[in-house]
Amino acid sequence: MKLRDSLAENKSIRLQAEANTWQEAVKIGVDLLVAADVVEPRYYQAILDGVEQFGPYFVIAPGLAMPHGRPEEGVKKTGFSLVTLKKPLEFNHEDNDPVDILITMAAVDANTHQEVGIMQIVNLFEDEENFDRLRACRTEQEVLDLIDRTNAAA
């Protein structure tokens, strides 16, 4: 499943969302996937449990979080949601806080998680200007166009 196709088909983009805590921000992304029947509601708690156990493991770059759980923690099919926050939040990551872009990922198996999910997100942000381009997006179509331009340049 391609990042762009998943976001478009599942209508799982939310821009300039308001959240007061990192937990609320993660829930916005998971709720988009629940609404699209990509994950079960328990996927949210699995992500919180992971943070309790391992720390903010999914904050992967300055300003960017990629919340995800394991396939057996409620994943029905592979999919992504993308959330930008109006106000950046602390996720308690010593290097990459504050976060204002969340790409929540659900993968049906570890191989998909590594090869499909992470690689597409790395590709999107290989051009660091895409962080600010994404922050400037105000419509779903602007996000999809940005991903299309990035894929065309790759």
From Swiss-Prot:
One of its GO terms (cellular component) is cytoplasm. Pfam families: PTS_EIIA_2. It comes from Escherichia coli O6:H1 (strain CFT073 / ATCC 700928 / UPEC). The keyword Transmembrane does not apply. The modification Phosphohistidine is found at residue 68. InterPro entries: Ascorbate-PTS_EIIA_comp, PTrfase/Anion_transptr, PTS_EIIA_type-2_dom. GO terms for molecular function: kinase activity. Keywords: Cytoplasm, Kinase, Phosphoprotein, Phosphotransferase system, Transferase, Transport. It comes from the Bacteria. It is found in: Cytoplasm. This is Ascorbate-specific PTS system EIIA component. The active site is at 68 (tele-phosphohistidine intermediate). Residues 6-150 form the PTS EIIA type-2 domain. The PTS EIIA type-2 domain is phosphorylated by phospho-HPr on a histidyl residue. Then, it transfers the phosphoryl group to the PTS EIIB type-2 domain. Induction: Induced by L-ascorbate. Repressed by UlaR. The phosphoenolpyruvate-dependent sugar phosphotransferase system (sugar PTS), a major carbohydrate active transport system, catalyzes the phosphorylation of incoming sugar substrates concomitantly with their translocation across the cell membrane. The enzyme II UlaABC PTS system is involved in ascorbate transport. CDD domains: PTS_IIA_fru. SUPFAM superfamilies: Phoshotransferase/anion transport protein (SSF55804). The keyword ATP-binding does not apply. GO terms for biological process: phosphoenolpyruvate-dependent sugar phosphotransferase system.
